[in-house]
Amino acid sequence: FHGEITSEKVAIGHIFDGSATLVVGTHTHIPTNDGRVLNKGTGYLTDAGMCGDYDSVIGMNTQNSINKFFKKDSLKHFPSEGEASLCGVIVEANPKNGLANKIDSFIYGGELKNIS
């Protein structure tokens, strides 16, 4: 499913609650801090984030992206070359029913840091 906005992703989580181990969004590239196990046992996170350089525009070259906003001459999008972050989710599932017991997100390297 394609979920552009957070409310669509939350709705998808509830649709699959109890039927899937995990529902995770990815489209916005920015990690959210709302990981939880839903009422019927599905792990949920609105957005896991991206694997890429956060000192950029969603992983792409910053100046080229800004030029596109102002319709200035720009090259095709190309990846930023800064230090990358690896963002993701770890889910602990019940081996008997396949549903989530616990969900944790992580951020490793780069500009972003986990907030305790």
Protein language model regions, located:
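Active-site rim beta-loop-alpha module in soluble metabolic enzymes
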Residues: 2-3
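Conserved beta-sheet core of the metallophosphoesterase superfamily
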Residues: 6-79
